[in-house]
Each structure stands twice: as structure tokens, then as C-alpha cells.
Amino acid sequence: MPQIKSAIKRVKTNATANKRNAAELSKLRTAVRKFNEAVENDAKDVLDLEVKAARALDKAASKGLISKNKANRDKSRLSKKAANK
């Protein structure tokens, strides 16, 4: 356990940030999974789910959870999947 005041605060802020980051990553993965399931099941709301997944990817990239290049690469893959179905 840290003894220095600033180190104690960093432990608290790191724990808070960890919870926030885990929640955002979970939202991202859920959005992408729902899109993939809709594509596999030929659902009608594929385009709406694609937009939601792309938005989640952009949000994660802006918060530093994933890199900007990964977000763009994943969005490209989403749009290819949506176009092929």
C-alpha cells in the first residue's frame, strides 16, 4: 500500500479509470456483437446496428481505449460485412 499522499490518490483514480474503461470496452464489444449477430441472421436493422457499432468504435478511439487505426479498420470491416449481406 502506498504511503505518499499522491500515490494513494493515484491508486484511487486508477481504480476509477479502470472501471470506466472496462464499461466502455464492454459497450463497444456488445455493439459489435449485436451487429455481427444481425448480419448472420439477416435482420432488417443491420444498417442501424452498423451505425451504432461505428459510433461505439469512434467513442472508444477518442477515449484512448483503442487506437484510431484499429477503429477505422474495424469500421471498414463492419461496412464490408453490411454491404455483402
From Swiss-Prot:
Gene3D superfamilies: Ribosomal protein S20. Pfam families: Ribosomal_S20p. Transmembrane segments: none annotated. InterPro entries: Ribosomal_bS20, Ribosomal_bS20_sf. One of its GO terms (biological process) is translation. One of its GO terms (molecular function) is structural constituent of ribosome. One of its GO terms (cellular component) is small ribosomal subunit. Keywords: Ribonucleoprotein, Ribosomal protein, RNA-binding, rRNA-binding. Belongs to the bacterial ribosomal protein bS20 family. Binds directly to 16S ribosomal RNA. This is Small ribosomal subunit protein bS20. It comes from Lactobacillus johnsonii (strain CNCM I-12250 / La1 / NCC 533).
